[in-house]
Amino acid sequence: LLAHGTREQIDTYVRPMMEGRFFGTMCLSEPQAGSSLADIKTRAEPQADGSYRLFGNKMWISAGEHELAENIIHLVLAKIPGAPPGVKGISLFIVPKKLVNADGSLGERNDVVLAGLNHKMGYRGITNTLLNFGEGKFTPGSAPGAMGYLVGTANRGLACMFHMMNEARIGVGMGAVLLGYTGYLHALDYARSRPQGRHPGAKDPSSPQLPIVEHADVRRMLLAQKSYVE
């Protein structure tokens, strides 16, 4: 938004994000369109006031619904009717969970609704969601559809989204390394506390068992883990 949004969008949405009051999401994939973004079906219908009404579903949305912030700002890829086919017809929209009034206060609930939770291995501190846009749970402004606001130029949404994803990719890689390192620390702690077997050549069956960290092959595997993540 700092790179492609208007001054009004920055003041309305970015500043509260930097203050920690608003959170954000990236809404790209859909149930029928994962990495094949040319096949997305979410549509954005233009309104007389310059806003848009969005209708569709978005899948695999991290932090798509929670109560940790005052508001959630969804950045949504969608197609305006009559847009070119494929990725050349994708636009980017701001779709807040709660509409923001001109004075910065929160207004009525937008028609963005949690439809389901996706359970992903390794992620326990954040929700991963399926979101419905414009399916009628709420009617902001007494009209159907989730209210959205165009970011940048129509049909250039994918370029805007990739601008953000370049930085997000670094975060994903860092998260993977941290998960791997946490796994190593848990494995090391377990190996130090789990007794099993004795030294090769030990003859006395009454001697105490060794913690498995003293077994050569376990030490080899722990060293491999440590070398990967460090």
What are these regions (language model features)?
Residues W60, L99-A115, K120, T127-A168, ...:
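A glycine-rich, basic-preceded beta-loop-alpha segment at the flavin cofactor/substrate interface
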Residues M26-S29, Q47, L54-N57, S62, ...:
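Generic beta-strand/beta-sheet core signal
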Residues S51, F55-R109:
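A short core secondary-structure module
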Residues R21-F23, D39-K41, D49, N71-I73, ...:
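Active-site lining segments that contact anionic ligands and/or coordinate catalytic metals
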Residues Q32-S35, E65-E67, P84, K120-T127:
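Short Gly/Pro-enriched turn/cap motifs at secondary-structure boundaries
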Residues L1, T25-C27, F55-I61, N71, ...:
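Glycine- and acidic
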Residues H4-G5, Q9, E19-G20, S36-L37, ...:
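Alpha-helical interface subdomain recognition
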Residues L1-P46, N71:
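Long, structured ligand/cofactor-binding scaffold of large enzymes
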